[in-house]
C-alpha cells in the first residue's frame, strides 16, 4: 500500500508510570488533562487513567472532581521517589 504499514501502539502501565512519576517530581498539583498534553492516543489516555487509579489506591495522590464532565485535579500526597513499578501490565 502507498500509505505504508500501520504499527500497533503499545503503551504499558510501567512506561506510563515512569512518565507520570517524572511529572509528579516537578508538579505537586495538576490536572489530568496536563498529563495528556503530549498528544495522547486513546490507548495512552486509558493507560494513564489506570496508572492514576493505581496511584490513588496506593495513597501517592488524591484526586478531586467538582462534578460529572468537570476537570479532574490531582494532588501529590506521597513521595514520588518511593513509587515502585506497577506489575499489573
Region annotations inferred by a language model:
Residues 1-89:
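A charged, low-hydrophobicity C-terminal interaction/regulatory region common to genome-maintenance complexes
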Amino acid at each position: 500500500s502507498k500509505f505504508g504499514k500501520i504499527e500497533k501502539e503499545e503503551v504499558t502501565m510501567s512506561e506510563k508510570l515512569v512518565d507520570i512519576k517524572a511529572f509528579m517530581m516537578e508538579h505537586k498539583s495538576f490536572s489530568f488533562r496536563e498529563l495528556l498534553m503530549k498528544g495522547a492516543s486513546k490507548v495512552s489516555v486509558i493507560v494513564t487513567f489506570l496508572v492514576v487509579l493505581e496511584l490513588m489506591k496506593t495513597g501517592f495522590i488524591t484526586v478531586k472532581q467538582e462534578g460529572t464532565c468537570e476537570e479532574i485535579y490531582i494532588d501529590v500526597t506521597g513521595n514520588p521517589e518511593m513509587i515502585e513499578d506497577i506489575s499489573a501490565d
